[in-house]
Amino acid sequence: TTPLPVLVADAFAYHERPGALQRLTPPWESVSLESSDQSLHVGSEVVLKTRFAGVPLRWVARHTEYDPPRHFADTQVSGPFASWNHHHEFRERVGAQPESGASLTDLVEYELPMGALVDFCGSSIAQRKIESMFAYRHRVTADDLQLIARYRSAPLRFAISGSSGLVGSNLTRLLTLLGHQATPIVRSKGHSSSDENDCAIAAWSDASEIEKFSDVDVVVHLAGKSIAGGRWSEQGKQQIRDSRVVKTRQLCESLATLKRKPKVLICASATGIYGDRGDTVLDESSSPGDDF
């Protein structure tokens, strides 16, 4: 059980928002969404791709109870457990103000596969993993609800380069959860992941497609050659730099040709901007380094 700083109805509604499931999946878990009915109603299903003991598995969950804003439940149809039943309970906290007095309780009943031996040997490991997962979920839920309450605005259309990366994928989930439209953009067809190319609104180096950016409110530019992709040879460092400097210039020049330009362009790089600072604690107000 965890306290939540909102009304019970808002706490329940959070779980119905698009992208909530992906947002609540811990980054250390090997779980990805294959398909979803985008609903908590009885009979709706979610299909996840996961691994058990290194073996790829599909986890199919079906919603079995739906009583807004108090309760919903799901059960495993097939997957890594012998059985799994998950109940989500939303209540007012005794003595708390209604606008900040909700609580969320997750009740999980499960059985491990392959009988008593696995139950005996693996139950404590499974219990710790489940407790860690729900500690993460509860913290993210509380933080997101505070964020939603703080930034209530009309939905915006975001175009994001590098949307399949660590930062881009998490930003996309968060923006979707907040009610915005977050769509990948690519430099050119065939130069990014297949997932990005399948749903990208435009390739910014293609003059015939740049007009598609006219309907975008915000462009977030995160694309760049990975700094962890190999040894930092002189050639590799030049590629890392060019992927940020040259490609960013190309994107800006392409956007500048539009009659109706995006209102905002955000270009972000990662911790490399600060250079080698040893054990110094760094944040957005820290000065940049002077090395590569």
Where are the regions a protein language model picked out?
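N-terminal Rossmann-fold cofactor-binding loop
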Residues: 185-190
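NAD(P)H-binding glycine-rich loop region in Rossmannoid oxidoreductase-like domains
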Residues: 200-250
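Glycine-rich portal/gate segments that line the openings of hydrophobic small-molecule binding cavities
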Residues: 22, 32-80, 95-103
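Hydrophobic ligand-binding cavity/cleft-lining segments
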Residues: 1-41
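Beta-strand/loop substructures that line and gate deep hydrophobic ligand-binding cavities in soluble
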Residues: 73-131
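N-terminal Rossmann NAD(P)H-binding glycine-rich loop of SDR-like oxidoreductase domains
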Residues: 158-178
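Conserved Rossmann-fold NAD(P)-dependent oxidoreductase catalytic core, especially the SDR/UDP-sugar
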Residues: 249-291
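Rossmann-fold scaffold of SDR-type NAD(P)-dependent oxidoreductases
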Residues: 161, 216-222, 266-268
